[in-house]
UniProtKB/Swiss-Prot annotation:
The record marks D212, G213 as: Cleavage. This is Serine/threonine-protein kinase PAK 2. Residues 74-87 form the CRIB domain. ATP binds at I255, G256, Q257, G258, A259, S260, G261, T262, V263, K278. Residues 169-178 have a biased composition (Acidic residues). A lipid is attached at G213 (N-myristoyl glycine). Interacts tightly with GTP-bound but not GDP-bound CDC42/p21 and RAC1. Interacts with SH3MD4. Interacts with SCRIB. Interacts with ARHGEF7 and GIT1. PAK-2p34 interacts with ARHGAP10. Residues 69-137 are annotated as: Autoregulatory region. The modification Phosphoserine is found at S2, S20, S55, S58, S64, S141, S152, S197. The modification Phosphothreonine is found at T60, T134, T143, T154, T169, T402. Keywords: Acetylation, Allosteric enzyme, Apoptosis, ATP-binding, Cytoplasm, Disease variant, Growth regulation, Host-virus interaction, Kinase, Lipoprotein, Membrane, Myristate, Nucleotide-binding, Nucleus, Phosphoprotein, Serine/threonine-protein kinase, Transferase, Ubl conjugation. It comes from Homo sapiens (Human). Serine/threonine protein kinase that plays a role in a variety of different signaling pathways including cytoskeleton regulation, cell motility, cell cycle progression, apoptosis or proliferation. Acts as a downstream effector of the small GTPases CDC42 and RAC1. Activation by the binding of active CDC42 and RAC1 results in a conformational change and a subsequent autophosphorylation on several serine and/or threonine residues. Full-length PAK2 stimulates cell survival and cell growth.
Length: 524
């Protein structure tokens, strides 16, 4: 990289995208301790008494009159469960009992048979993670651990025991009750994991067809969900402001379109301030409680390095979220269209770490740090944002615009479904720093499922040209991309790293922003 101080006079040429380099461990698997090479345990037999309970509420009457007198009436189960049992045959190298949807995903994943045989548990981990509907929140609250002892890995999918709770306080039990959803018709490479519940509503759980009582239980759950949605809408009405946003804001100009809504710029009539307004169609939001959570969190998070929430309105089923507008666009435009020097990268990393230190101090994990979610002001200000509500501002013709929410920035402990905390954001920041160097994250050209496998088994990715980076920058990256979470730097610690002392003034980003805008105009 060049430290050319004349950047303002002549912006550098846009970088040419190169294929991702896959890190090789020379046969050594950093996560071998977590993913045993032995065959997975055999499928445990179902317990007989379960069928007796089913017969009680399924309408069977043979020989049941006497028993009905002896025992109280048993209601249908409130949490019907469709358990998946998957095994692996080390001799044939084939999985047994794998759901058809998973098998299809695996066939198109480009994970080789050798890789599957080498680490079958890692394959199951990433399949379950990729197909899980628990990856649904972007801003998440977390509880600081009282003890250092967390589970070292996820249990095998055919284990009967319950999984130890993660540090993150999200309801992960729900996904254990649902079978893998049907593969969406759109290409997997463009699918957003974080917005999967918005783009592809998860189908109802698949139960045993002969259990009428279970079907009734599912109907009961659906009614309960509908009632909960009504309660959520009522709660939302107590949070938003009263009024018509079309009267308070004028000069609406569409700048983005997403799966469940649209992003506009507009002008505040009273203040003359330009704002960004996200118009969200709540009918396309199956998890409306997440919207309440995000609004409440954003209302509390006021920080110079976070795009500020301004107001919200509810008009019918349309939610309008008003946010601070930054005209410089996303960092993605800069990293894909220009070349950044180390001092400019240091400036961006410092600003993002300041935002993360604030979030983590308030027990919030962002969990989606990437260049797409870093917005720039024309004067060079750097702010974290989250457009997970509905739309992405990046133009649709851009290759990167389809990659929002994909797994390339995820920390290994997230992919392998271990307990995790705020340091997942630090890993993602390290991946974003690689973006600023190379124009893309590692494994971008891989199938998303194989990318997850490589993250889980390879760990720290390798740079394409590490010799071009200064030792101090490489050390910063190593601190961010440390596999051992305990050794990985925190936001507070990394703010003291010598690399950040190299940072140029934020105004040095303005020429890059201008150059990126010009390059994007010429590409249209």
């Amino acid at each position: 990289m060049s430290d050319n101080g004349e950047l303002e006079d002549k912006p550098p040429a846009p970088p040419v995208r190169m294929s991702s380099t896959i890190f090789s461990t020379g046969g050594k698997d950093p996560l071998s301790a977590n993913h045993s090479l032995k065959p997975l345990p055999s499928v445990p037999e179902e317990k007989k008494p379960r069928h007796k309970i089913i017969s009680i509420f399924s309408g069977t009457e043979k020989g049941s009159k006497k028993k009905e007198k002896e025992r109280p009436e048993i209601s249908p189960p409130s949490d019907f469960e469709h358990t998946i049992h998957v095994g692996f045959d080390a001799v044939t190298g084939e999985f047994t009992g794998m759901p058809e949807q998973w098998a299809r995903l695996l066939q198109t994943s480009n994970i080789t048979k050798l890789e599957q045989k080498k680490n079958p548990q890692a394959v199951l981990d990433v399949l379950k993670f990729y197909d899980s509907n628990t990856v649904k929140q972007k801003y998440l609250s977390f509880t600081p651990p009282e003890k250092d002892g967390f589970p070292s890995g996820t249990p095998a999918l055919n284990a009967k025991g319950t999984e130890a709770p993660a540090v993150v306080t999200e309801e992960e039990d729900d996904d254990e009750e649902t079978a893998p959803p049907v593969i969406a018709p759109r290409p997997d490479h463009t699918k957003s994991i974080y917005t999967r519940s918005v783009i592809d509503p998860v189908p109802a759980p698949v139960g045993d067809s002969h259990v009428d009582g279970a079907a009734k239980s599912l109907d009961k759950q659906k009614k309960k969900t509908k009632m909960t949605d009504e309660e959520i809408m009522e709660k939302l009405r107590t949070i938003v402001s009263i009024g018509d946003p079309k009267k308070k804001y004028t000069r609406y100009e569409k700048i983005g379109q997403g799966a469940s809504g649209t992003v506009f710029t507009a002008t505040d009539v009273a203040l003359g301030q330009e704002v960004a307004i996200k118009q969200i169609n709540l009918q396309k939001q199956p998890k409306k409680e997440l919207i309440i959570n995000e609004i409440l969190v954003m209302k509390e998070l006021k920080n110079p390095n976070i795009v500020n929430f301004l107001d919200s309105y509810l008009v019918g089923d349309e939610l309008f979220v008003v946010m601070e507008y930054l005209a410089g666009g996303s960092l993605t435009d800069v990293v894909t269209e220009t070349c950044m020097d180390e001092a400019q990268i240091a400036a961006v990393c410092r600003e993002c770490l300041q935002a993360l230190e604030f979030l983590h101090a308030n027990q919030v994990i962002h969990r989606d740090i990437k260049s797409d979610n870093v917005l720039l002001g024309m004067e060079g200000s750097v702010k974290l944002t989250d457009f997970g509500f509905c739309a992405q501002i990046t133009p649709e013709q851009s290759k990167r615009s389809t990659m929002v929410g994909t797994p390339y920035w995820m920390a290994p402990e997230v992919v392998t479904r271990k307990a995790y905390g705020p340091k997942v954001d630090i890993w993602s920041l390290g991946i974003m720093a690689i973006e600023m160097v190379e124009g893309e994250p590692p494994y971008l050209n891989e199938n998303p499922l194989r990318a997850l496998y490589l993250i889980a088994t390879n760990g720290t990715p390798e740079l394409q040209n590490p010799e071009k980076l200064s030792p101090i920058f490489r050390d910063f990256l190593n601190r961010c991309l440390e596999m051992d979470v305990e050794k990985r730097g925190s936001a507070k610690e990394l703010l003291q790293h010598p690399f950040l002392k190299l940072a140029k003034p934020l105004s040095s980003l303005t020429p890059l922003i201008m150059a990126a805008k010009e390059a994007m105009k010429s590409n249209r």
